[in-house]
């Protein structure tokens, strides 16, 4: 393998602004030219009444389950509006979906007691049930507006846990048609476009007419962060060139390299 296996290659990342800096760094280190086309935006808008009830009851929870790094940030941003001391979380244990979520939790000097090896919510629930007896324990699932109820249902019905759910952020489609990034994408195209979620795939489809590379521009192949996003690409009819083995910067870089080999 060349020291710069992505030299002269162009890669587009579609994550929300301010996310995926480590992905970009890993790709640039491999020689790629990287541009960003944020197809989604994150808004932290929890239900204040529900949030107040949850924070009032923090000492009652046995586990807090985070399904994303955005959930961690959204929860603790509001947590510290109420409390000034991290010890106010009490003796709760934490479960995280994936290494990015675990990394976000560590930024608050908290360790994850369980991190799912696979990047899907049901795997997190199954691992938690397999390694810990949570029957009759009180669990708080912190999530976003697009997450399905499968994880809370699994924990409640399969593990007989007492489950509360709070949505602390919303993922919304971002229009990029008139942006400089979109104009550059149309003009130059790319070798690879990386999708990090099914909602990013959906946003791309909705804006496909304004994101079509010009004649003579590079026609990109798609790489998915994981199996769920890969399925969304297939269902959308977008040719899939590769899927990362894990939702990490190194795995994304390797998937891009393999897709272009």
Residue ranges and their predicted role:
Residues 1-261:
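Signature of uroporphyrinogen-III synthase
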